Amino acid sequence: MELDALVQQVMARAFVELEASGRHVHVTEAQAVALFGHKLTPARELSQPGQFLAKERVTVIGPKGKFENVAVLGPERPEAQVEISLTDGRTLGITPPVRLSGNVEGTPGAVLEGPMGLVELRQGVLAAQRHMHVNSADAPNLGVHDKQKVKLQTYTQRPVIFPDVVVRVHPSFQTRVHLDYDEANACGFQNGDLGRVLP
């Protein structure tokens, strides 16, 4: 076996690429039309298949402050969601619960502003639970299964062990760990950094 292939095989068995996820918004098709006058327009693909960064941007408004030029991710979803960090929440005057994406029941709301209008969300603001997307083929090599919580060692400028990283396994996933900016800054994350699931 060639050295490069051997290195790749070892990496696949031990290490996972880290990604930092900044504040962003998911909207429904009706909300996209209300905010922008049309459905979302893809600007570039994201690491997870089928998902994209939209050309459109919104302002997220809370009781105490707002963030302008916030990224919108597509495609449209059945229910809106605003993913922010705990630090972002202080600026907005919102205390976001830590939840997995899609679990918006009972979360705080916010106002979204686009060029064509406003959308008031009664719920949907959360801080994303740190998690890892794992392709089904990689799960046995990493020794993980769907919905499992694992400890993750980061190999970053300021190495950290993160507990309670939720594993999500699916055949379409690219294997990646998603941290929010609070977590990424805490460990000194840079693009290309890796993590390892601890036994």
Predicted regions mapped to residue ranges:
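Short beta-strand-centered segments at strand-helix junctions
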Residues: 19-63, 68-115, 120-147, 151-153, ...
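Short coil-to-beta-strand transition motifs
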Residues: 159-161
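Acidic, glycine-rich active-site loops and adjacent beta-strand->loop/helix elements
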Residues: 156
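C-terminal end-of-chain micro-motif
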Residues: 1, 198-199
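Short, low-complexity, charged amphipathic interaction modules
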Residues: 1-15
